[in-house]
Amino acid sequence: MDLTISNELTGEIYGPIEVSEDMALTDLIALLQADCGFDKTKHDLYYNMDILDSNRTQSLKELGLKTDDLLLIRGKISNSIQTDAATLSDEAFIEQFRQELLNNQMLRSQLILQIPGLNDLVNDPLLFRERLGPLILQRRYGGYNTAMNPFGIPQDEYTRLMANPDDPDNKKRIAELLDQQAIDEQLRNAIEYTPEMFTQVPMLYINIEINNYPVKAFVDTGAQTTIMSTRLAKKTGLSRMIDKRFIGEARGVGTGKIIGRIHQAQVKIETQYIPCSFTVLDTDIDVLIGLDMLKRHLACVDLKENVLRIAEVETSFLSEAEIPKSFQEGLPAPTSVTTSSDKPLTPTKTSSTLPPQPGAVPALAPRTGMGPTPTGRSTAGATTATGRTFPEQTIKQLMDLGFPRDAVVKALKQTNGNAEFAASLLFQ
């Protein structure tokens, strides 16, 4: 490697001097004593503003020296001056370094290769402190084996906090630093003992078929209803079967507009065909299998075997390589559904001539605790022995499916007023 030596006492520059990177520092000192007028009793050798201990036996490579680096020969500093430098505040230390760069053209020429725009920064004290201050302070404290203070914060701040630890603001700051220490300790332990916690877990997908069209379905036990996208409804030919009377809003982490509902479609999982109803949303994911379908068919999510057991068949969850990356983005998370069927249905031109279909029951908006419907509704209701009132419109819709009024009211009572669950109970 090539090194340049600058003697600031005489103004002379030596080099580049070609030396081996494996040369010991003591050998380099001996070379400088012979050729550059270096005297260990009067001079110090500087590298990157740090004094190199002339008694070290480490190689130049181990000390971090590289080709084209600059070494400075300066006069020894008295102990009192060294003590003053050690007691400088962080801002004063940064300013001292800036002044050193202003007065030392050789050092500035070396650092400008590593710090673009250094000439402009040196001439602006405020910008210099803002841009290079953190790096200079890191260099100042980085040479110690342990942090200058237990919190690893600037020494000025630590001194201020410890000077009056009972001050409310200081006490709050100290508590924050202690909490951060605990968080950092937890992070280190987690990285060391449970690194798998930092890997991304693939979502649960299975292969299904709808109208002979293969689909990768997302299994979500946290979703209340099973969802199909409008795009897939068109591809599978089910868009004409969407009951648009069930327009509403899906609510979860966000909200989504419900286009309607497909009351029944055959879904093939492995060799088994099972009936399924879909809430149709304009979403990016094709199919989301929710809790309604999973509970109806007594599904079991077996994460140990990585399979889904449903309707007496078993299908494997897809591996991460089998899941398109686009599927991982923008997953809908509706957990509750509010439809316009809470209001009396208004027949449309396309639906007025159609008789009610089995299962065509409005999904009422979930209520906290599944409590009774407010009595202030415009439609009359049936009151049970417990004083619970059900909307007359809901009772009529269930009776239109061919069930007597007493059975409808009983089913609504058993399902806490949920019309969809009541219909499922009546059909059993």
Curated annotation (Swiss-Prot):
Active site: 220
Region (Disordered): 328-388
EC numbers, comma separated: 3.4.23.-
A biological-process GO annotation: positive regulation of DNA replication
SUPFAM superfamilies reported in the protein's UniProt record: Acid proteases, UBA-like
Coiled-coil ranges from the UniProt annotation: none
Activity regulation (UniProt): Inhibited by the proteinase inhibitors indinavir, lopinavir, nelfinavir, isovaleryl pepstatin, ritonavir, saquinavir and tipranavir.
Tree of life domain: Eukaryota
Bias (Low complexity) ranges: 338-354, 371-388
Induction (UniProt): By DNA damage via PDR3.
One Gene Ontology CC term in the entry: plasma membrane
InterPro entries linked to this entry: DDI1_N, Peptidase_A2_cat, Peptidase_aspartic_DDI1-type, Peptidase_aspartic_dom_sf, UBA, UBA-like_sf
Gene3D superfamilies the record matches: Acid Proteases (2.40.70.10), DNA helicase RuvA subunit, C-terminal domain (1.10.8.10), Phosphatidylinositol 3-kinase Catalytic Subunit, Chain A, domain 1 (3.10.20.90)
Subunit structure: Forms homodimers. Interacts with RAD23. These interactions are mediated by the UBA domain. Is also able to bind ubiquitin and polyubiquitinated proteins. Interacts with the SNAREs SNC1, SNC2, SSO1, TLG1 and TLG2. Binding to SSO1 is promoted by the phosphorylation of 'Ser-49' of SSO1 by TKP1.
Functional description taken from the UniProt entry: Aspartic protease. Appears to act as negative regulator of constitutive exocytosis. May act at the level of secretory vesicle docking and fusion as a competitive inhibitor of SNARE assembly. Acts as a linker between the 19S proteasome and polyubiquitinated proteins like the HO endonuclease and UFO1 via UBA domain interactions with ubiquitin for their subsequent degradation. Required for S-phase checkpoint control.
Leftover remarks: Present with 6510 molecules/cell in log phase SD medium.
Family per similarity comment: Belongs to the DDI1 family.
Record-given protein name: DNA damage-inducible protein 1
Annotated source species: Saccharomyces cerevisiae (strain ATCC 204508 / S288c)
Gene name per UniProt: DDI1
